[in-house]
Amino acid sequence: MELNPFLPLLTPSSEGTPFEFECELETIYWLNLHLRIPTRILIRYAEFSALSFAELFDKSVRLPWNQYICKDTVLNIRTTCRKSKLYHSDAVTQRIHEAIQSNLGCKLQLASSDDQSQLSKQQLIIVRLFHDHLTISIDSSGNPLYMRGYKQTSAKAPLRENLAAAIITASGWQPQYPLFDPFCGS
């Protein structure tokens, strides 16, 4: 299995994500480069309770955003709110955006929700607010990992690369045996 070296670090997650673990930044680089199955790798950046917009802003503005966000970055903030006093996801997104700008001391463009054209130039920030508990995650992968690689020409594939890799891994296939690909890799 591709995560065997990391099994001692992995713990089940209650948020529906398959794995959660702690590691160094260098390990995240390695994971993004070598893993075939994940779509993206998120860095759990902050967790705190937020019962009001003022509290949300105050706690968000104190985070060291300069560790992951440059001053010319276009932000793509995706927010979901469930069973919380702060239920308006656009207002939560606005407060997080304002907090980041205030912290960095500059204006940052906020990508519109329908602007998917320049994903590689955007920094994805995922904000989840559930039962008044806020979690901020920063995408470390850029484009989805199934889009990586140099492909001059390609056809529309019946499966994404990471889903195909997951199926092959789950099948128990070993590299020393031939693999028959009925789709011929599209």
Write out the residue ranges for each language-model feature:
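Non-catalytic nucleic-acid substrate-recognition regions in nucleic-acid-modifying enzymes
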Residues: M1-Q123
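Flexible, glycine/proline-enriched loop segments at strand-loop-helix junctions
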Residues: K85-Y87, K151-P158, T169-A170
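Beta-sheet entry/capping signal
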Residues: L124, H133-T135, P178-L179
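Class I SAM-dependent transferase core
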Residues: L134-L159
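Conserved S-adenosyl-L-methionine
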Residues: L159-S186
